[in-house]
Swiss-Prot record:
This is Dihydroorotate dehydrogenase (quinone). Binds 1 FMN per subunit. It comes from Vibrio vulnificus (strain CMCP6). FMN binds at residues 62-66, 86, 139, 172, 217, 245, 268, 297, 318-319. It is a peripheral membrane protein. Its cofactor is FMN.
Amino acid sequence: MLYRLARAGFFQLDAEKAHDLAIQNFKRFTGTPIDLFYRQQLPNRPVECMGLTFRNPVGLAAGLDKNGECIEAFDAMGFGFVEVGTVTPRAQSGNDKPRLFRLVGAEGIINRMGFNNLGVDNLIENVKKAKYSCVLGINIGKNKDTPIEKGAEDYLICMEKVYEYAGYIAVNISSPNTPGLRTLQYGEALDELLVELKRKQAELEEKHGKYVPLALKIAPDLTDDEISQICQSLINNKIDGVIATNTTLDRTMVEGMKHAQEAGGLSGRPLQSRSTEVVRLLRKELQGNIPIIGVGGVDSYVAAKEKMLAGADLVQVYSGFIYHGPGLVRDIVKNL
């Protein structure tokens, strides 16, 4: 009820202004009596995945807390894990505004943010100050002005800087809002990137005395053959996990709706069916050898269960959290 009232107010604002205000409020109120409005004690539902122990299988997807400013707030809400970022080596402002749109009737969101963030060094400073007990994932990407043929260098820079502080590292090669980025999902380009990442992972494991798993985040807009090829690359390069999926460019589910033709990636309920199908295809190809984090339209216990029945070991929420608030986390965890 409280969240519904808060949402009504936030939804009167421009979508990005509402997002920024929410982040500011979480920063301001966490650790004060006001955080009782969103602090939750949830039952333990431990899951072993990628060599880590998650207190429950429900995580916050990347994109909501790009700079790691609100880790303590999301930890207080009971998430089993929180994925911050996407972060790039250098700060960048992202694409021109407006760049974030609600499709309220479909419980969807379209964004063309373009990896706006304050840079990896800023994120690390925020992580170092935060106190939390959930698993922390850090999602890394490349700067827009880095040529795609030099993209691996950006991932390696970020990886080196976040390794010590991350529970796992998510490698984002599937955002539709950075020109050319999705080409890294295919063939030799993918294999070359994964070889470099695994080499760096081994080097950093020796340096820091701990193994930090790598998870690759993929797009929903892939053919069955492309998914099969990605799976072969994941297996061949011993990647620790796969996150399925990022946002979609497909507008079939929202045709005719206000904002439906805005450029960018569509998330939320309209993505639910396709992302679950990708999870199913991954499970069939990977045969349980590589864990799957399912994301895309997880807006209820039923949707979370569908992802897990399709083969997801963990699930993440983003748009569903915007529409339903912290109660969504509670409902999923309690009913699993």
